[in-house]
């Protein structure tokens, strides 16, 4: 059975293996053991209540409960940009016009922005390619909404998610090549690694301070503004079906889109509810997959179960209850895994 649980210190080697499979561009999952160990420690201290809000971050892993294999990772930053500035570009417009010459040009322009300062962030989503099946990707991504719904007061009103931009298997980023490299004088992979290992001071020091007309970039770079890496397209679709939208903010490195949503408008958060759980044999039928989570802050767990999402009393097997660290009579959080498709 696949289970979402909080990260533990013993997971560092598994996270290193996952990091080696990302193919680059996933800034918050660098293949650096010291950085990953520090990330785990920060998550543990967050759960223990030892950090200020500006440093808090939760990390979860997807584990096969039978073998102990860690198949994926996901995380939530509680409030970005309160310690180090959180930069992105806002894609806006500058108009240059002359009535006398009968010239009017509306030019797409990139403005350096810190507009998302203080927002909660969904980040570090990665599922081992060998485990991309049977709803694991949905479970990994959406489990975070169950945690946010259960502990709503720990998060801010806006949630953002940076999507990985277009970068090839050799680490080539058209957007970086045309823009970032001119200011940073280093390859994309180097800048990405420095940022991922916490060495972010160079961003504020070297970033262009003035608006940038996108027409001055290569056509290849212009074409990838707001576009996602092919492997990230499913993750973007998942978030958009939950209510997230692209509001013309992009990553400063690879030009990937930043999606955002008011936390209380996220479908899985808004529609999740608490039901009593009982042990038994679940009813057979053509039921949809649902997310089921406990309400235990320190021992949070999420699993998938096929059941009626409108039930008032959820029947789970002994194995499912054990995976959730629940007992009969406890209340669990339940929501349909995927939104019901509307028909005309």
UniProtKB/Swiss-Prot annotation:
Keywords: Acyltransferase, Arginine metabolism, Transferase. GO terms for molecular function: arginine N-succinyltransferase activity. It comes from the Bacteria. It catalyses: succinyl-CoA + L-arginine = N(2)-succinyl-L-arginine + CoA + H(+). Its EC number is 2.3.1.109. Succinyl-CoA binds at residue 125. SUPFAM superfamilies: Acyl-CoA N-acyltransferases (Nat). The active site is at residue 229. GO terms for biological process: arginine catabolic process to glutamate; arginine catabolic process to succinate. Pathway: Amino-acid degradation; L-arginine degradation via AST pathway; L-glutamate and succinate from L-arginine: step 1/5. Belongs to the arginine N-succinyltransferase family. PANTHER family: ARGININE N-SUCCINYLTRANSFERASE, N-SUCCINYLARGININE DIHYDROLASE. Catalyzes the transfer of succinyl-CoA to arginine to produce N(2)-succinylarginine. This is Arginine N-succinyltransferase. It comes from Shigella boydii serotype 4 (strain Sb227). The gene is astA.
């Amino acid at each position: 059975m696949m289970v979402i649980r909080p990260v533990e210190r013993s997971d560092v080697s598994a996270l290193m293996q996952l990091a080696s499979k990302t193919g680059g561009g996933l800034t918050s999952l660098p293949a650096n053991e010291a950085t990953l160990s520090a990330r785990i420690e920060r998550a543990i201290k967050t759960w223990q209540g030892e950090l200020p809000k500006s440093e808090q971050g939760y990390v979860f892993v997807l584990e096969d409960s039978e073998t102990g294999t860690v198949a994926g990772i996901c995380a939530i930053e509680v409030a970005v940009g309160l310690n180090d500035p959180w930069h992105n570009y806002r894609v806006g417009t500058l108009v240059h016009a002359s009535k006398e010459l009968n010239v009017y040009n509306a030019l797409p322009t990139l403005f350096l922005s810190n507009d998302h300062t203080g927002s909660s962030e969904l980040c570090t989503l990665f599922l081992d390619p060998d485990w991309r099946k049977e709803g694991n990707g949905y479970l990994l991504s959406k489990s975070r909404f169950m945690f946010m719904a259960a502990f709503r007061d720990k998060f801010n009103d806006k949630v953002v998610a940076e999507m990985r931009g277009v970068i090839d298997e050799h680490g080539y980023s058209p957007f970086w090549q045309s823009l970032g490299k001119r200011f940073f004088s280093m390859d994309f992979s180097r800048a990405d690694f420095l940022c991922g290992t916490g060495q972010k001071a160079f961003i504020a020091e070297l970033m262009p301070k003035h608006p940038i007309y996108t027409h001055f970039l290569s056509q290849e770079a212009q074409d990838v503004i707001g576009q996602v890496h092919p492997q990230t397209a499913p993750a973007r679709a998942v978030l958009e079906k939950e209510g997230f939208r692209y509001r013309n903010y992009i990553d400063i490195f690879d030009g990937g889109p930043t999606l955002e949503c008011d936390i209380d408008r996220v479908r899985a958060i808004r529609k999740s509810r608490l039901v009593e759980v009982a042990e038994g044999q679940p009813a057979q039928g053509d039921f949809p997959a649902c997310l089921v989570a406990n309400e235990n802050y320190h021992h949070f767990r999420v699993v998938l179960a096929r059941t009626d999402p409108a039930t008032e009393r959820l029947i789970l097997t002994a194995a499912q209850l054990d995976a959730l660290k629940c007992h009969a009579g406890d209340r669990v959080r339940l929501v349909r895994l995927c939104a019901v498709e509307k028909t005309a």
